[in-house]
Amino acid sequence: MNEIREAAVQTPEQATAVIRAEALAKTYAEGKMRTPVFDGLDLSVATGETVAIVGASGAGKSTLLHLLGGLDIPTSGEVYVAGERMSALSDAQRGKLRNQALGFVYQFHHLLPEFTALENVMMPVLLSGKDVAVAKGQALQLLESVGLGHRVEHKPSELSGGERQRCAVARALVNKPGCVLGDEPTGNLDDKTAGTVFELMLELNRAQRTSLVLVTHDRGLARRLDRVLELNQGKLRELAPSAV
């Protein structure tokens, strides 16, 4: 992908950013109706940094996360992932970059029900072109690190809610991405299990230097991240610790 990388000189902050958004805008259109979500939004996430995005329901938090992950296309502006300008990539190239550079964890685990925990976690490695033995080795290592080494042959229906979400975290991290994007990753769990999964994500962040960008309604969890950004009326602003 080097041939499509920007030729422009980057600032030190830009060069070390795992994800960067510049003048990002998104407007949904239906017939003659236009619904702007945000306009002129800037964001930079450094290697190993943890960022929480908070805001009211309907503020556009999930939309922003989808744009950062290349799952949606901005109306204008640019998103850079691992130094690559997403708008310059084909659909196939974007998919490959997502698989290699990003991990995704959602409120609902989205594990494939017909496959075991091991097979679910192996999937991103296989999609990156590595052979089965390598994929199995990486998946087993991650499942062990999230406390599921004894559950690798169980299907999602045989796992508890917390175990399914831990499996989803392992799947997100198995390719050692630069950044994990989480959309309410603990929102469907009870408080105790949510705390366990959140601690796990922070431990893996420290161990692998993987950046985290988490959309959450839980201000208590948000306060434990490096930065808290509030999306309100299309604007993104950093909150002081006392305001979170």
UniProtKB/Swiss-Prot annotation:
GO terms for cellular component: plasma membrane. Keywords: ATP-binding, Cell inner membrane, Cell membrane, Membrane, Nucleotide-binding, Translocase, Transport. CDD domains: ABC_MJ0796_LolCDE_FtsE. Gene3D superfamilies: P-loop containing nucleotide triphosphate hydrolases (3.40.50.300). It comes from the Bacteria. Its main location: membrane. SMART domains: AAA (SM00382). ATP binds at G55, A56, S57, G58, A59, G60, K61, S62. It is an enzyme of class 7 (translocase). It is a peripheral membrane protein. It is found in: Cell inner membrane. GO terms for biological process: lipoprotein localization to outer membrane; protein localization to outer membrane. Its EC number is 7.6.2.-. Residues 19-244 form the ABC transporter domain. GO terms for molecular function: ATP binding; ATP hydrolysis activity; transmembrane transporter activity. The complex is composed of two ATP-binding proteins (LolD) and two transmembrane proteins (LolC and LolE). PANTHER family: IMPORT ATP-BINDING PROTEIN (PTHR24220), LIPOPROTEIN-RELEASING SYSTEM ATP-BINDING PROTEIN LOLD (PTHR24220:SF689). Part of the ABC transporter complex LolCDE involved in the translocation of mature outer membrane-directed lipoproteins, from the inner membrane to the periplasmic chaperone, LolA. Responsible for the formation of the LolA-lipoprotein complex in an ATP-dependent manner. Belongs to the ABC transporter superfamily. Lipoprotein translocase (TC 3.A.1.125) family. This is Lipoprotein-releasing system ATP-binding protein LolD.
